Regions:
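Transmembrane-helix signature of 12-pass secondary carriers
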Residues: 1-179
Length: 179
């Protein structure tokens, strides 16, 4: 979905999925409804493992990409820690504690979704869609003082030389792929 919808729109829908999953799981009254909303949350998690690092690597300056993608991974672990702590604190509130544990997930999900609205679209994605003026504006925003036309040319050259998934199955990659 990130190539079709764009990174930003995909990240927004991931936040919507997270929010609906949290609230739906907390308010579900039967196992099938509960499973449906947990599945919806799983779709959001799965999509975020691809969309978020892709967005970060495409929007970050080259010198900061590794650090920022690493920070994304750290934040996943930190989020798990916060979830354990919040679940511990909520565990003693009675027989509906599980509903609170699931429903409280909606708070960071809503905050995330609202913040996604303020981030710029990926300039690399914009260039692949031939939306050059929008890409130029984003590049000027995130790379002040740099030659934006040169950056656009470099990104376009990288996009042209990009190895697609279909190329992985050619003969020269077959043996390493099997390993």
């Amino acid at each position: 979905p990130t190539n079709r919808l764009g990174r930003k729109k995909t990240l927004f829908w991931i936040g919507v999925f997270y929010t609906i999953s949290a609230l739906g799981s907390a308010f579900s009254n039967d196992p099938i409804t509960f499973a449906f909303f947990r599945f919806l949350g799983g779709l959001g998690v799965g999509a975020s493992t691809i969309a978020a690092p892709a967005y970060i690597s495409e929007i970050a300056p080259a010198k900061d990409r590794g650090k920022l993608v690493g920070l994304y991974q750290f934040n996943i672990v930190f989020g798990i820690l916060v979830a354990f702590l919040s679940n511990y604190l909520l565990s003693g509130i009675g027989e509906n504690a599980w509903r609170w544990m699931l429903g409280v997930e909606a708070i960071p999900a809503i905050i995330y979704t609202l913040f996604v609205l303020s981030v710029p679209q990926s300039p690399r994605w914009l260039l692949t869609k031939l939306r050059n003026d929008e890409a130029r504006n984003v590049l000027q925003l995130i790379n002040p003082g740099q030659d934006v036309e040169k950056l656009m040319l470099e990104i376009n050259q990288e996009n042209e030389n990009k190895v697609t998934g279909e190329n992985i199955f050619i003969k020269k990659y077959r043996f390493p792929l099997i390993l």
